[in-house]
């Protein structure tokens, strides 16, 4: 509260690792769900979106609550948020498997990226997504936090330049 009063234009973000919108909305600043308590977090992380899109990527949208219907059903609860436009959406981060897991499914990434970037959320891109970095936590945290390829003379490849990227990247 004091931080918001002293610096009203400063944004605070909370990693609310719950996978249902009602639980996430509870933590956003001025939520009626948590009244009279107030977390004062202006931005909460949408782990529900993360969970739904990572489940949907392996499903067909054939029946209710599968595939993109699963993602859509996440957004119908936006009315629970005091400020849905100040919710942070992501498809992967440093604590999760990479969106591509251990694969390199470009069409899947091409479907998820526009949704992430155009939804009524603050999009968060984890470094390496743009060059299709993959990895799973079951191997280790370090496997999903590998160094970005490039930037140092000792790097075998340099994805910071077009010449250092593969055709698919």
Predicted regions and their residues:
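Active-site-proximal helices and loops of the catalytic beta/alpha 8
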Residues: 1-82, 87, 104-106, 114-118, ...
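Surface-exposed cleft-lining segments at the edges of enzyme active sites
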Residues: 97-101
